[in-house]
Amino acid sequence: MYDSVIIGSGPAGLTAAIYLSRAGLKNIIINGMEPGGQLTTTTEVENFPGFPQGISGPQLIEDIKAQSKNFGTEFLQAVVKDIENIENNGKKIFKLHLDNGNIIEAKTVILSTGASAKYLGIENEKENIGKGVSACATCDGFFYRRKDVVVIGGGDTAMEEAIFLTKFVNKVTIINRRDVLRASAIMQQRAKDNEKIEWKLDYTPKKVLADEKVTGIELLNNKTGEIETLATDGIFVAIGRTPNTKFLEGKVEIDDRGYILTKGKSSKTSTSGIFAAGDVQDSKYQQAIIAAGSGAIAGLDVEEYLRENNL
């Protein structure tokens, strides 16, 4: 029996684990399908305090993980399929059913499952994921050396992906369906200063063109209404994230976009004993440092819950 099971191993879950372990509480992290979360696909993190020269996303995750391990956190590579709420000797406990058939019991649960990449949902896109369509430049950029690619999106992630890809490719074209970008001023300027980056603003992607692998993309010119074809070897989609909460339907209250609702400034969900931290409950900011902070809140909330309920 664990004092707490943490589902998800990004900065929120790992920070919660540090707080729980330092409080002497037995806890385990279920890594999930994307161990380490979004940071494992981030090349350089420049806005996490304590690293004046920046740090790679994977290294930051490894460092936080090592810190939690030092205090006694356990780790398990598995995926939670269901959470069962039961009574045991008059006390509420949770049974977590894993994809390997095992069951873990815990007094509390922290949900830090993060969010996964969104795709466009256009014609021929799904069929060509892995054949020229990708949502991870860090993972796949190397395969496009000396080729032409496009990045779809107008936020910081899109700018970062495009800049990273210029290390390998001949040319990156950023496509955005509006004529203005959502990215921060500094990221916009970095992209605009890069000679390998070109722009297609106010264009809507309509169809992926492929012949065994991606050859181009059809775009709607929003100003003229005409369809244009752009030849490309790779399509990198960077339009945001979808919270990983499908398996939680009926377990905790979720908003219409799939984000977990928490009470006030706490990590408490609609279900007593279940807490949420990180991007899975943050539809606005989605920053590593904020996820870590919310993980700390979850750890403290769990400690308080266990104490108040004599668990």
Question: What are the roles of these predicted feature ranges?
Answer:
Residues 116, 121, 127-143, 239-286, ...:
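FAD-site-proximal beta/loop scaffold in flavoenzymes
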Residues 17-18, 41, 121-124, 162-164, ...:
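Short amphipathic alpha-helical segments
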Residues 1-3, 77, 145-147, 202, ...:
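Phosphate-coordination loops involved in phosphoryl transfer and adenosine-cofactor binding
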Residues 2-71, 147, 159-185, 200, ...:
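Beta1-alpha1 glycine-rich phosphate/pyrophosphate-binding loop at the start
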Residues 10-11, 34, 115-117, 156-157, ...:
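Residue-level detector of alpha-helix initiation sites
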Residues 75-87, 92-145:
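Glycine/small-residue-rich loop that forms an oxyanion/phosphate-binding "nest" at active or ligand-binding sites
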Residues 68-98, 103-106, 167-264, 304-311:
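A Rossmann-like FAD-binding core segment of flavoenzymes
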